[in-house]
From Swiss-Prot:
This is Nuclear phosphoprotein UL3 homolog. Its main location: host cell. One of its GO terms (cellular component) is host cell nucleus. It holds the Pfam family Herpes_UL3. It comes from Varicella-zoster virus (strain Dumas). Belongs to the alphaherpesvirinae HHV-1 UL3 family.
Length: 221
């Protein structure tokens, strides 16, 4: 057992040097909670020369030229809790990026799914005595990387994909027992002080996605 809870993904990214930006909420009239972290607005020029070669591994390994790598400095995290569509939303976002942003280079991770009750054993016993047994939470997360100059385009495509979701039936949330018409989707935007270099094979432009099958679009990370 851990003495302390592990940090959240946004907290870990902030500790690694990614500055957090807040955007509009995916649900109209939904109250947003201010982040406890300040946004890093001061950026420094990258000290890496674009014409230099980027070594791979330790000394003595084969060096690849800059043409094999793509620099990224902006990261979007798409996260939802209790999304009924499972991976349908994240697969839709991938297809939207491939079809509508084919002229820019974007990298996208696979969908990460998590589940858990989110309550301590003692609290769970108390809730059981009150005849309220919360079901487990299901969380989906996906990360999209792009360059700062392309961030507005990627941001708009993300919001368009989220807002274009079909209305779903009312259901009982596991947290408070109240009915809500739609599951909120959160988009976090981070900006790095230094560029992150990824091999071009890991970008969406090199990853074919089957647009006819709405549930099985995947990319490599």
């Amino acid at each position: 057992m851990f003495s302390e809870l592990p940090p959240s993904v946004p907290t870990a990214l902030l500790q690694w040097g990614w500055g957090l930006h807040r955007g509009p909420c995916s649900i109209p009239n939904f109250k947003q909670v201010a982040s406890q972290h300040s946004v890093q607005n001061d950026f420094t020029e990258n000290s890496v020369d674009a014409n230099e070669k980027f070594p791979i591994g330790h000394a003595g390994c084969i060096e690849k030229t800059k043409d094999d790598y793509v620099p990224f400095d902006t990261l979007f995290m798409v996260s939802s809790i209790d999304e009924l569509g499972r991976r349908q939303l994240t697969d839709t976002i991938r297809r939207s990026l491939v079809m509508n942003a084919c002229e820019i280079t974007v990298a996208c991770t696979k969908t990460a799914a998590f589940s858990g009750r989110g309550v301590s054993r003692q609290k769970h016993v108390t809730l059981s005595k009150n005849k309220f047994n919360p079901s487990s939470h299901k969380s989906l997360q996906m990360f999209v990387l792009c360059q700062k100059t392309h961030a507005p385009r990627v941001r708009n495509l993300l919001y368009e994909s989220i807002r274009a979701r079909r209305p779903r039936r009312y259901y009982t949330r596991s947290t408070d027992g109240k009915s809500r018409p739609l599951v909120p989707v959160f988009v976090y935007e981070f900006t790095a002080l230094d560029r992150v270099l990824l091999h071009k094979e890991n970008t969406l432009t090199d990853q074919p996605i089957n647009t006819e099958n709405s549930g099985h679009g995947r990319t490599r990370t």
